[in-house]
Amino acid sequence: MTDSIRRLYDGVRAAHDQDPGSSRTARLLQAGPRKIAKKVAEEAAEGALDAAAGNRDDVVRESADLLYHLVVLWYEAGVQPKEVWAEMDRREKLYGIAEKIPKNRIVELKRPAVVPIDRARRRRAR
C-alpha cells in the first residue's frame, strides 16, 4: 500500500506543473489548501455515511477518493508520505498498531518546551 501512496504522491507532484485546464489535480492545487482541506473533509464524511448505511462498495470508492485528496493535502502542506509512515511507526511502538494515540498525549507531544531567555541574551542573539 505504501508504494501506491508513493506513486500517487509522485503523480500529484508531477501534476503541480500541469495546466489546470486539463488536470483536475493541478486545478485543486491551484485552488489552495482551504479547498483541498474541504475536499478531504467531504470525502471523509461521505465514506463515513456510506459505512453507516452499510454501502460497502461506496465505502471503498469514497476511501480511494479520501486517500487521493489526503495525498494532495500532504503535497500542498509539504508533508512527505515517509513522514506519515514514520509517525505511524513511532505510534505503533508506543501504543500498538491498532491503537490511537490518546488526545492528552498528542497535546504533550506538540507542546514546545518553554525555555526562558533573558532580554540581554535575546538582544545579543539578534
Regions inferred by a protein language model and the residue ranges of each:
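Flexible "arm" and connector segments at domain edges
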Residues: 1-62, 68-126
